[in-house]
Design a protein with these regions (language model features):
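Metal-dependent enolase-superfamily TIM-barrel catalytic cores that perform enediolate-based chemistry
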Residues: 159, 164-276
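N-terminal secretory signal peptides
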Residues: 1-2
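N-terminal export signals
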Residues: 5-30
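Glycine-rich, aromatic-flanked loop segments that form ligand/cofactor-binding clefts
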Residues: 133-174
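Shared catalytic-loop signature of beta/alpha-barrel
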Residues: 259, 270-395
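C-terminal segment of N-terminal export signals and the immediately downstream linker at the start
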Residues: 21-61
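Conserved, mostly hydrophobic/aromatic
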Residues: 88, 145, 263, 305, ...
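Metal- or metallocofactor-binding catalytic centers and their adjacent structured scaffolds
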Residues: 44-53, 83-147
Length: 405
């Protein structure tokens, strides 16, 4: 596909921001040649077949409640698609949305050159194909024999911190004989052994599962206990919108010696409430990051909150927003001094996709970890070193399927 054709399919401002760098918005000759070579390689391949399946991810333990939701279980059965070309290349990834939605548009991909659907320095070229967004990134990496982070511009990936997102209200389980805070500390020790040096604690027990005062005190006690037991770890907290702003300041008053790395979703975001929280933490001398945008994100409101410096970290889900859309969003966040940490809960696959997004584009303050094993996917290429997640240098996302689809 000619360069002018795929540029025409994009919003010009996004295309120019992605394709052009440096003084005078001029691409280097090397970049132009590399782009042309990659496009030619992708044009040799046509989409021949799309297949669907699932992969089972297994958590190392039962994951319990959060402020709003009941037990999260032992791991999801993730819907995936595999995209095969007429030259025998195959890429795969989680579906964005349902299989039914994907099947309704798959005919728009069949028979097309990969270069008609995907450009390495852009991502997918038609938003209608977002169901296959991540799989097309993997496929392009396989064809070009490059890891996805290299498609995004880095020979060696940026690396960033990696936190355990596995610490829920497991002190409340089993319901007939709750294990108490010792269970939380046991889980933190396990996660520390995995390699995490950041631990995210779910809080908000008084929203639904305990009387408010009792739940608030348990949140405070858990936070203080974990911070004391793991002094070399960053502590993050996530309220899942289970507080009011006044209730949340009560929580902060109960943990004066804990230096929180970030505060996530203490309440459903509004300008007034985040202004009140920002004013409080500033007056109290609390240095922490405010992170939001996961649950039912309102893009216009989030934009306002970031522009007003009321939020620091954007959390919208890596699959929900889409990999290509995250590529578009990242420079916009940088313009307002904000950082990213795409929501990845549920599937370790999403953590690993995020490692490539962060590896190629940086500006990612930490990555959500969802500790898992799988008999269906080879996850061994990814490593945790010094508390950071290191993606592999193999093609695509570097996760070979161990099952046929």
């Amino acid at each position: 596909m000619k360069r002018r054709t795929f540029l025409h399919t994009l919003n010009w401002s996004i295309a120019s921001a992605t394709l052009y760098h440096g003084a005078g918005n001029a691409m280097s000759l090397t970049a132009i040649l590399d782009s042309n070579i990659r496009e030619k390689e992708l044009s040799y391949h046509r989409i021949q077949e799309i297949k669907y399946s699932t992969v089972q991810m297994k958590y190392p333990r039962l994951v319990g409640k959060n402020a709003r939701l009941d037990l999260h279980g032992y791991g999801p059965n993730v819907e995936i698609c595999g995209i095969k070309t007429d030259k025998g290349a195959m890429g795969w990834a989680s579906l964005r949305g349902s299989r039914k939605d994907a099947e309704q548009i798959e005919k728009e991909l069949l028979g097309k050159k990969v270069s008609e659907l995907f450009a390495p320095n852009i991502g997918i070229l038609n938003d209608r194909h977002i169901a296959f967004d991540i799989a097309l990134h993997d496929l392009a990496g396989v064809i070009l024999e490059k890891p996805v982070y290299e498609l995004l511009g880095r020979d060696k990936p940026y690396t960033t911190d990696y936190y355990s997102g596995m610490i829920y209200f497991d002190d409340l389980e089993p319901s007939e004989k709750p294990a108490g805070i010792d269970r939380i500390l046991e889980e933190c020790r396990y996660d520390y052994g995995v390699g995490y040096r950041q631990l995210k604690l779910k809080i908000g027990r008084g929203h639904k599962w305990m009387p408010f005062k009792e739940g608030l005190q348990r949140d405070i006690d858990v936070t203080n206990a974990v911070a004391q037991a793991f002094p070399d770890c960053g502590i993050l907290v996530d309220g899942n919108n289970g507080f009011t702003v006044d209730q949340f300041t009560q929580y902060l008053k109960g943990i004066p010696s804990v230096n929180l790395f970030w505060i996530e979703e203490p309440f459903h975001e509004t300008v007034a409430d985040y202004q009140k929280l920002r004013n409080y933490i500033k007056a109290a001398g609390i240095r922490t990051l405010l992170a939001d945008g996961e649950a039912d994100p309102n893009p216009a409101l989030l934009k306002e909150l970031f522009e007003k410096k009321l939020l620091d970290v954007h959390l919208t889900d890596i699959e929900g927003l889409g990999f290509t859309n995250w590529r578009r969003l990242m420079p916009e966040l940088e313009k307002v001094g904000a950082q990213a940490s795409p929501h990845a809960w549920g599937s370790l696959l999403k953590s690993y996709y995020t490692a490539h997004l962060a590896g190629g584009l940086a500006n990612t303050v930490t990555i959500e970890g969802v500790t898992s094993t799988s008999d269906d996917v080879d996850l061994s290429g990814y490593k945790i070193q010094d508390g950071k997640l290191i993606p592999p240098s193999t093609a695509g996302f570097g996760m070979p399927l161990l099952k046929k689809i």
